[in-house]
A protein has these predicted regions:
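Alpha-helical transmembrane segments of multi-pass membrane transport proteins
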Residues: 1-443
Length: 443
């Protein structure tokens, strides 16, 4: 059997096993081991590759960025920073058409700039924003749809766990990826906000239960001083992490350490943390870190198996013969990623697709920082699309209202999926949106 045939069968086996429910990292390791064995005809070569990849993949101080930003995210969640951000946005925006929807988007954008996990945003704002919108007469479908849609900002606005993973797989600067995600994240938040205003103006019954917002007399306005105090932790975290990163004071790892220290101080000052909850936060951080570490190790083995087979070079030559230009390649790539997003999770898509597609992106001369932002947006669309739609399932499991079905949530996310797709096309055809803040684009 030729190496190309082995690699092709490995890809098919991998997708089948993941779809059957096998853990992604285990699938990557097992399929890669068998693939190397078949290519080289010697199981000892495959075993040596496993051992070497385990050492090479994460033996770097740069990898410290993963547990630090994960820890920051769990600490700000327990300190109710997201809840406070929503309360401030609610006070400022609720009198606008679709104001609570815009407030949800705005507070999600703030929360995204502190924690890099979309499902954390989905869980927090399902508990905080959905009951408030229902109280004001918003349509249940819209309420859950806007939470699901805006939760994807958590993976685009830095810090972002997906961008960290992309940085490791593509050997790109995590700091540059974070900086490149700022403007696209803000553009997506703005697109959501404008879309909500248009929906509330042109199709009010898609936003409000009875076509108009209901007054809630038991919702007193908070004093300005209280609003400032509620927003202060978010401002401190964003200024210390993103401000320090963009100004060049910190590397990505140092920014993660700073964010974790500030988040810990906020949680302690607010008396939201005791020994039991601290242990819980540290345990959850350990679980996520080990999971990501194992994924990266196994992805390294998979990448080396593909390189050994010659599959990336074969695909580059094949596409060159087809005469496909950079835009054509990118549109096919984005379509593939979105389709995969309907059946497997975000991390799995990156781990499976990038080792094959990065050589082609380089062959076409694409900026890999911009390519990373486009990839993350395309992958995140999968969080909202059936049948997988991870954010949708998180919202359903967190939601206390049994009247809202899974189908309602998927239908509610449809307008936001379309808006996200429009922003994705804008990013593809206007690359400077993601490169404008970089001091040395692509560096």
């Amino acid at each position: 059997m030729s190496p190309i045939a082995v690699a092709s069968l490995s890809l098919l086996a991998m997708l089948g096993l993941i779809w059957a429910g096998m853990h992604v990292a285990v699938v990557l390791a097992a399929v890669s081991f068998v693939g190397v064995w078949l290519i080289r005809g010697d199981p000892s070569v495959a075993a040596n590759l496993l051992a070497q990849a385990s050492q090479d993949a994460i033996a770097s101080h740069i990898f410290g960025v993963v547990p630090l930003f994960v820890l920051t995210g769990f600490l700000v969640a327990i300190a109710d920073v997201g809840k406070d951000a929503f309360e401030v946005a609610n006070q400022l925006l609720r009198r606008l058409r679709g104001g609570l929807g815009i407030a949800t988007v705005a507070s999600n954008a703030v929360f995204a700039a502190i924690t890099g996990i979309s499902i954390a945003s989905a869980a927090v704002f399902t508990r905080v924003a959905v009951p408030e919108m229902l109280r004001f007469g918003y349509h249940p479908r819209f309420a859950v749809g806007v939470v699901a849609g805006s939760s994807v900002l958590g993976m685009l606005i830095p810090p972002s766990l997906l961008m960290i993973l992309y940085g490791f797989l593509a050997n790109q600067s995590v700091g540059d990826l974070f900086t490149a995600g700022i403007v696209p994240g803000l553009v997506l938040a703005l697109a959501y906000s404008l879309g909500i205003v248009l929906m509330a103006t042109l199709w009010p019954r898609s936003v409000y239960q009875d076509g108009q917002v209901q007054a809630a007399p038991d919702a007193p306005l908070l004093p300005v001083g209280t609003l400032v105090l509620k927003l202060l932790p978010s401002v401190l975290l964003i200024a210390s992490v993103l401000g320090g990163l963009y100004a060049g004071f910190f590397t990505a790892t140092e920014a993660g350490a700073t964010g974790a220290a500030v988040a810990l101080a906020i949680a302690l000052l607010r008396r939201k943390l005791n020994l039991k909850s601290l242990w819980g936060v540290l345990t959850e951080t350990g679980h996520v870190t080990v999971s990501v570490s194992f994924l990266i190790i196994c992805a390294t083995i998979y990448t080396r198996m593909l390189a050994m087979s010659g599959m990336p070079q074969f695909l580059v030559e094949w596409l060159t013969q087809l005469g496909l230009g950079p835009t054509g390649f990118l549109l096919i790539y984005v379509g593939l990623v979105i389709l995969l997003g309907m059946i497997i999770d975000s991390s799995s898509i990156l781990l499976i697709v990038l080792p094959l597609m990065l050589p082609m992106a380089e062959q076409y001369g694409l900026n890999l920082i911009w390519f990373g932002v486009v990839t993350v947006v395309a992958v995140e669309i999968g969080l909202l699309t059936p049948p997988f739609g991870l954010s949708v399932y998180v919202i359903k499991s967190t939601l206390q209202d049994q009247r809202i079905t899974l189908g309602d949530i998927f239908r509610g996310t449809a307008p936001f999926t379309l808006m996200m797709f429009a922003v994705l096309l804008l990013l593809i055809f206007v690359p400077q949106l993601s490169l404008v803040l970089l001091k040395t684009p692509g560096g």
